[in-house]
Amino acid sequence: MLQLDEILANATTAIETAASLVALDEVRVQYLGKKGELTSQLQSLGKLPPEERRTAGQEINKAKGAVQQAIAARKDALQRAELETKLAAETIDVSLPGRRIENGGLHPVTRTVERIEQFFGELGFSTESGPEIEDAFHNFDALNIADDHPARTDHDTFFFNPDLMLRTHTSGVQIRTMEHGKPPFRFIAPGRVYRNDYDQTHTPMFHQVEGMLVDENVNFAQLKGILNEFLCNFFEEEVEVRFRPSFFPFTEPSAEVDVKRKDGKWLEVLGCGMVHPNVLRSVGIDPEKYSGFAFGMGVERLTMLRYGVNDLRSFFENDLRFLKQFK
């Protein structure tokens, strides 16, 4: 009992000097725990004479209450200090200059595809898609491409095996769409295509948009009118357009379409023609009843012309200095 004042003084000092909640809890255990010093004092009351026990018990409980209050007060102070430190660390200096958040922008190729889709969508053309890994029937056979055509060689096409390849055009989408429907058809097919070529004007992967219209009494004059209107709309000016006779296995007659540049030179921008009867037959459509036209354009080529880009490879190098120009 004679140690009670000393225990209380030591406990008070330990509580006041506890620098953290963990240290404070250690003090609590030391004095108030099951084996704590004040708890031991209570347990030793039985050794005192009966007449002294009550007074001693009251003194011990009084000391115990004082320690509990001191611990509670110190705990509250430590928690407030911890919160203040945390808030101070999270304080925002409103006088600091703000961080500029860069706005993203559409890739120029995406812009071109969306512009093409919008124009033809207004003419009633739907947008179709298909697999990028294509079989020989949809990529070559159904399109009237002969077995000895150069496109069937490894020099032009990425083959997985003789009957499976990365598609070289989106024409396969035209075949698949006609296979699963009945005329009339009016759609475009944008997408990635692959050819074994890489230089200033060619990349192994590029984008194409092909279009097709199949119905009764479709003629070449309608094709010319639509493409002429499209090119003027795309370049946002009246451009001079010419159609040159050409050859494509899947169209007959066929033509290449050129636009006249400001320097007076002609530049090819797309190919087109009337759908070959063999293509219609390959999907079970009677060429005596139905006719159609088809066209195809390289998206990167049109994008280069629209924005004055000289090297097609710039579109795929992810150089932000280049891409920021198109925001």
UniProtKB/Swiss-Prot annotation:
This protein's UniProt keywords: Aminoacyl-tRNA synthetase, ATP-binding, Cytoplasm, Ligase, Magnesium, Metal-binding, Nucleotide-binding, Protein biosynthesis
Compartments, as annotated in UniProt: Cytoplasm
Pfam families in UniProt: Phe_tRNA-synt_N (PF02912), tRNA-synt_2d (PF01409)
Protein name per Swiss-Prot or TrEMBL: Phenylalanine--tRNA ligase alpha subunit
Organism of provenance: Photobacterium profundum (strain SS9)
Residues involved in Mg(2+) binding: 252
Enzyme Commission number(s): 6.1.1.20
Cofactor binding: number and manner: Binds 2 magnesium ions per tetramer.
